[in-house]
């Protein structure tokens, strides 16, 4: 289900205008993509902070932005935070139409770690990648990709090509047609005796 956020159109741009917005409890943002010009908007910072704390999958979800003209479906493309305070300073949204492909990093959720034969034999599980870059339609964008490691033996790796992906989702690393990009995702080291 898509979350609906309220935004307002920004008329002033630049460092000073953005600073005034932040002091007023708002976050400057921009919506870009598609065949439409970029649109500068502002959102309430407490609304964004609350939503991100409650739903960490928002980074890979389609959001609806209302109040700045027509309602637009978007994904969060970039979110910038202040280095000392952690407050959100700017957000980039990319328009997400049903016909346009989006490319986004998606987290991997590893399942069955404790029941893996390699771990039961005393092997150590190593995670080489915890996120992967996928390309798909916005409506097919997964919030996470489940990786079953319950059958992984000691001394073996699970590679990108062995991941089970949702329908319509492709790994960008494998679209090159070269097996050099088929990297290991997770592996279990052999037991030393």
Swiss-Prot record:
GO molecular-function terms, A-Z: 5S rRNA binding; structural constituent of ribosome
Alphabetized InterPro entries for the sequence: Rbsml_bL25/Gln-tRNA_synth_N, Ribosomal_bL25/Gln-tRNA_synth, Ribosomal_bL25_b-dom, Ribosomal_bL25_C, Ribosomal_bL25_long, Ribosomal_L25_dom, Ribosomal_uL5_bac-type
BP term (GO), one: translation
Residues forming coiled coils: none
UniProt xrefs under Pfam families: Ribosomal_L25p (PF01386), Ribosomal_TL5_C (PF14693)
Gene3D superfamilies according to UniProt: Ribosomal protein L25, beta domain (2.170.120.20), Ribosomal Protein L25, Chain P (2.40.240.10)
GO cellular component: cytosolic large ribosomal subunit
UniProt keywords, alphabetically: Ribonucleoprotein, Ribosomal protein, RNA-binding, rRNA-binding
Subunit structure: Part of the 50S ribosomal subunit; part of the 5S rRNA/L5/L18/L25 subcomplex. Contacts the 5S rRNA. Binds to the 5S rRNA independently of L5 and L18.
HAMAP family: Ribosomal_bL25_CTC
Family: Belongs to the bacterial ribosomal protein bL25 family. CTC subfamily.
Function field: This is one of the proteins that binds to the 5S RNA in the ribosome where it forms part of the central protuberance.
Protein name: Large ribosomal subunit protein bL25
Species for this entry: Hydrogenovibrio crunogenus (strain DSM 25203 / XCL-2)
Lineage: Bacteria, Pseudomonadati, Pseudomonadota, Gammaproteobacteria, Thiotrichales
């Amino acid at each position: 289900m898509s979350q609906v956020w309220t935004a307002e159109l920004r008329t002033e741009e630049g460092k000073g205008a953005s600073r005034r917005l932040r002091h007023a409890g708002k976050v400057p943002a921009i919506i870009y993509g598609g065949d439409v010009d970029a649109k500068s908007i502002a959102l309430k910072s407490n609304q964004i902070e609350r939503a991100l704390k409650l739903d960490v999958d928002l980074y890979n979800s389609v959001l609806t932005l209302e109040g700045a003209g027509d309602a637009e479906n978007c994904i969060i493309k970039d979110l910038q935070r202040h280095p000392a305070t952690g407050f959100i300073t700017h957000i980039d949204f990319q328009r997400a139409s049903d016909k346009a492909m989006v490319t986004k990093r998606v987290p991997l959720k590893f399942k069955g770690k404790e029941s893996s034969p390699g771990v039961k034999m005393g092997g150590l599980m190593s995670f080489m990648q915890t996120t992967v870059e996928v390309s798909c339609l916005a409506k097919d964008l997964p919030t996470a990709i489940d990786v079953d490691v319950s059958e992984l033996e000691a001394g073996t790796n699970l590679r990108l090509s062995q991941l089970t992906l949702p329908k319509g989702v492709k790994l960008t690393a494998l679209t090159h047609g070269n097996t050099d990009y088929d990297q290991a995702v997770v592996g279990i080291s052999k037991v030393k005796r």
